[in-house]
Amino acid sequence: MSLQRTGEHHIPIDADVVPSIGVDISNLPLDKTKTVQIKEVGGAMMPLWPTYLKGAAALMYVVDISDAYQLAASATAFHHLCGLPAMRDKRVLLVWNKTDAPCALRDAETAAFDAARAETALKDALTTIQVSALDGSNAEQVMTWIRGVYGV
């Protein structure tokens, strides 16, 4: 992601994204003076997730809704995270990714994820956004949410 002279973000889109395995750390510019560090922690690192949450300002949880086989596992991990003490008073963004994929799950199928249950656990600190990794649809909404977390 890069900040253009106009102040708008250019978000490069990679349609051949694979799941994270370890930890990927990126710096994300929010404006001309503020940059935040984003830590993408893969599912294989699940036992260490609570450690990363302790110092986090918020949680962004990305679900690949083109992968029906992983939805139940993603939901289980997400609900576990939402119940951790380290999540107390943290804002959470649930990102439904790859919504434009031909095999993307529809609303009736993603209802099994039970995001409403997480809203109760998080005391309404949950925001949900649907995005496309292919064309970048709604990526700016994600940036707006991140800026809101940091007061930018």
Language-model region placement:
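TRAFAC-class small GTPase G-domain
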Residues: 1-152
